[in-house]
Design a protein with these regions (language model features):
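Amphipathic alpha-helical
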Residues: 67-93, 294-332
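Conserved catalytic cores of soluble enzyme domains
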Residues: 14-15, 155-277
Length: 338
């Protein structure tokens, strides 16, 4: 049996998709809403932007000026040196002023690689540690190990937060344990900035590599305690500066200043794999393994064949490395030790 279309008689013209109860004067877009209620909408937008920028203010303008007066960058300025991309900051809503409780943690994108980062904000409580931000730091360190990405630590801490009592030690305890768990799993590059004592000196040395610029200090205690306990006058540089630490092997690399230390960390990172399951980055080369290099042949001949005492002649191995590796590109660790 044939059933006719329900609207074949032309009744469709009596129907409409428009809502007869709609109020046409209501704003239909975000822009229209902003114009319709400008005060409340703009107030919320401005407040949102203010909250996003609040963490970067740290402990306030006056403390940032003090940091600059000492010739030091803030933690946010150091992050900007490491990457031009906007960092993905994690756990930053800790603290009454969204200051991250004195520690900034996040994920950076450095030349296409994800890198976990933490950095003490010295403008907030002198970057000191308590149980709260210690748990936050441990969480960030373990996250790097779980995701198989390198870790960069920017240490600028006065040590445990004294008013917290033993809570400061609890914070370091969690961070120490986390560092041991990722050891050998992902590479960690630690940088020393400012004046670090106590736990602030213990923690970074547990990393894979340690870089210290000039005009910085880290040690279990400072010169004043040495003077009181031993009656010996000693400067911070003599006790815990980059020169003494480089010669003893505590520090792997030294730098002229903070900027040099950060750039050294970036170059070191370019030689390292993301984790122990992946190969290190490599660059294509047009050189052949069996290729003859005239400069290399001359160097070997002058050192061994033409020397009066043959293999007993002392030589600078760095000259050989420059000839053996592609384009003379290699990265020396602990150059001042021994």
């Amino acid at each position: 049996k044939h059933f006719p279309h329900p609207f074949s008689d032309g009744t469709m013209k009596n129907y409409s998709l428009e809502n007869p109860f709609a109020e046409n004067d209501l704003p239909s877009t975000v822009k229209d809403q902003e114009q319709a209620v400008p005060s409340r909408y703009q107030e919320m937008v401005d407040r949102g932007r203010e909250l996003l920028e609040l963490p970067k203010k740290g402990g306030g303008e006056s403390r940032v000026q003090v940091q600059h007066g000492k010739g030091r960058m803030t933690v946010w300025e150091r992050i900007r040196v490491l990457t031009e991309n906007d960092p993905h900051i994690t756990f930053q809503n800790w603290g009454a002023q969204l200051d991250g409780a004195g520690i900034v943690t996040g994920i950076l994108n450095i030349k296409g690689r994800d890198v976990a980062l933490y950095g003490h904000d010295f403008t907030v409580r002198a970057g000191s540690m308590d149980a709260t931000n210690g748990a936050k730091l441990a969480r960030q360190i373990l996250m790097a190990g779980d995701h198989g990405i390198p870790l960069i630590g920017m240490n600028d801490s006065a040590g445990a937060f004294v008013p917290a009592g033993v809570g400061g030690l609890d914070g370091y305890s969690e961070a120490f344990q986390a560092m041991r768990k990722i050891s050998g799993v992902v590479p960690s590059i630690m940088l020393m900035f400012g004046y670090n004592a106590g736990g602030g000196a213990y923690l970074p040395r547990q990393g894979s590599f340690l870089i210290q610029p000039n005009e910085t200090f880290f040690g279990l205690t400072g010169p004043d305690v040495v003077r009181e306990a031993l009656g010996e006058d000693i400067t911070p540089d003599e006790l815990g500066g980059p020169k003494v630490h480089s010669q003893s092997g505590v520090v792997d690399l030294s730098a002229e200043d903070e900027l040099g230390a950060l750039r050294t960390a970036l170059r070191l990172l370019s030689y390292l794999p993301d984790n122990n399951r992946e190969l290190a980055p490599f660059a294509e080369t047009s050189l052949e393994l069996e290729g003859y290099v005239e400069e290399e042949a001359i160097l070997l001949r002058k050192t061994f064949a033409d020397s009066p005492s043959g293999f007993n002649t002392p030589l600078d191995m760095r000259l050989f490395l420059q000839q053996l590796v592609d384009y003379g590109d290699y990265f020396e660790l602990q150059p001042e030790r021994g």
